[in-house]
């Protein structure tokens, strides 16, 4: 798998030549549920529900992205723009995601990680020896994503207007 080799090279180039061995050393047998999908598909909500149900630890790659931006003293939007020219940010977040997937930093018996691409990092960690991974991919219609956006970002009134006025069309 070419992308596995690409991830390994990026980690060695940006994190350090011993970064892969450090990840291997952190791997535990703790099961991890990796939830991926598009924006506004319910990843965070369901990941939190699963973590609560199994009395596990919840991680959000989006929160990690926000923490990295705050640490750099920039907004999330500014950091997102930097991703176009600065590969190191993405690699740092991917590496931290792999550290989460290792299971080393959780006190509970299971972890739940949600984000746009944790399954890719899970495949990489599996190549390094991590086992007990479950991958779930969330999708929903464009209409549902738009309605979720209205509710989350604008409020219930906008959501109700959207519900009444946005046509239910299959765009696939």
Language model regions located:
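Hydrophobic anchor at the beta1->P-loop junction of P-loop NTPases
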Residues: 35
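Walker A/P-loop
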Residues: 44
